[in-house]
């Protein structure tokens, strides 16, 4: 689960199960599991998932914000790829990098710093858009 939490999006099959079983071994989730989970779901769900160590299904995971999409495909990897292509197909790599960076900054930095960086990104991109429309 910790690896999935580090991703920008999580796509699951209908029969996927999610859990933090570490507590059954006397451990807490590692590798940023708690921190990243707190960024996605309500803190009450975090307590439940970690202390109970119960498995949750993909539908419940989607309802609490842990999973973004549930795929019914026989080929979930390609369906996930197709979803990402559909989201980004007509966007420049620079735009995608800036969107991801701005979202991460909004989550991790103090608001003043995040807004400053976001405004700088916007201005850089706006100049490029203006220049490209004048060519």
Q: Where does each model-flagged region fall?
A:
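Crotonase-fold acyl-CoA enzyme core
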Residues: 1-93
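C-terminal alpha-helix plus adjacent terminal tail
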Residues: 53-59, 74, 78, 82-135
